[in-house]
Amino acid sequence: MEQTNFRYLKREDIEDDLDFASVDVSFISLTKILIPARNLLKENGEMVCLIKPQFEAGREKVGKNGVVREPEVHREVICKIVDYADSIGFTVLELEYSPIKGPEGNIEYLVHLRKEKEPEEAVRLLTEQDAENRLKEIIAGKSGLSQTEVWQTLIRETVERSHSMEEKHSMEEKQES
């Protein structure tokens, strides 16, 4: 849905529940649209979301021209999105880096989510602010899904692969010039 503020989209704004959604938002965090998106998906509906570190990291972590280059910042951003999605009732299925960089050269990532079933009422009724507060508690307590050994490994390896491909492309470009 081009030119639509997804944050404010309601179930009655669309004809049917969605089987699938692809999400590519700019100038806003994914955390702002995951609850509305979840409410529009069918049970077992899936989403693939583009994680853009330049819009997830704080301003102090974004470099010149809006580019985030530090692998540690990429890991932090991915952990935040994985933990947030998990905390609002998504199953996080997969993570990979995008083979296409953002316009300024940002490395971006793809996360695959599934709405398994209706969550407990407390999760279903979460407001955006409630979910953000819950995420802060998860991050402070280092207790989220991203802190499990499996996800720590997946996140680390994905970020390492994305940065090694970035280095490879940079070297190829230098050789061509």
Residues of each region from the PLM?
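S-adenosyl-L-methionine
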Residues: 1-28
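Short "lid" loop at the C-terminus of a central beta-strand within the Rossmann-like core
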Residues: 6-7, 53-57, 99-100
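A short glycine-rich, Lys/Arg-flanked "PGG" loop and its adjoining helix->strand segment in the class I
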Residues: 31-46
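Residue-level signal for inorganic ion chemistry
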Residues: 52, 105
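Short, glycine-/aromatic-enriched active-site segment of Class I SAM-dependent methyltransferases
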Residues: 53-70
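Short alpha-helix
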Residues: 74-88
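Conserved S-adenosyl-L-methionine
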Residues: 90-99
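Flexible, glycine-/basic-rich loop-and-beta segments that form/coincide
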Residues: 107, 111-167, 172-177
